[in-house]
């Protein structure tokens, strides 16, 4: 029965976003653009905090500018070292954690975005940029790309988690929040009870965007959710075994109500990791060989009040990450049918 439902769900949402001459589907070509709209009706009333939702780590880092100044998120030692042009090229290999653009991630099924932002030295127009060691695209450009997708897919809901701010004073925050408001308008969902956030309740009000803002500035705007409503425990390890143990432990400690929960299924390089794999970069040195084990862990999980909710990964296109997370929701379907 479960196999039949999975096949049916793939017919509904597993279409191809772009043709592949070989006839096979890579992870980046499987299109889950409308997976939320395609969930069975009884899941429309399940709180989003109880669904399995795929997300990406450092979601914006598919492009970073090696010609820009080093970001204020780096130490003074790194900033001084980066005066050597080769250093920035190497930094780029370790700053990029995604291959897909926002649009491509959305089409692949990603619905949670991990965002770090900063002002840029020398800019006088208060423009805000994404940042991960090096500066990425303008936040405004990213927001517009996301909004264009949402307009075309009115039943898809996204989480934008602004969790790190660098070199930003109150005027920068005001500028950023006004940009968010201008980009999404009536799609913005006001902060309220987490348990009341279901697909049906959001669809009825035409809300599509939940903004989490890890800064006291959130109190000034009703559509900014406090960061404490979406905890994302960080393992900070290069060991996949330690990562999985950490994920299991933090899930067991998850609050059953009042917050979403992010399981960061990511490995973090240490200085010696970078030194050993300097030229290879993050993807080739640490991520690629460990992703299969991480995906195997994901496959063993169940969503629900005490189960997984949002799961994030680096390089979400390298494996069938998003589809694997989405299909965990079939387990909620199983439970519902068992009770009938």
Swiss-Prot record:
Keywords: Hydrolase, Lipid degradation, Lipid metabolism, Nucleus, Transducer
Main localization, broad class: nucleus
SUPFAM superfamilies given in the database record: PLC-like phosphodiesterases
InterPro entries xref list: PI-PLC_domain, PLC-like_Pdiesterase_TIM-brl, PLCXD1/2/3, PLipase_C_PInositol-sp_X_dom
Catalytic activity, as annotated: a 1,2-diacyl-sn-glycero-3-phospho-(1D-myo-inositol) + H2O = 1D-myo-inositol 1-phosphate + a 1,2-diacyl-sn-glycerol + H(+)
Subcellular location: Nucleus
Tissues of expression: Expressed at highest levels in brain, followed by stomach and small intestine. Detected at low levels in kidney, ey, thymus and slkeletal muscle.
GO cellular component: nucleus
GO biological process, one term: lipid catabolic process
Domain PI-PLC X-box per the UniProt entry, residue ranges: 42-215
PROSITE patterns on file: PIPLC_X_DOMAIN
Molecular function, one GO term: phosphoric diester hydrolase activity
Active site: 57, 132
Protein name, as recorded: PI-PLC X domain-containing protein 2
Organism: Mus musculus
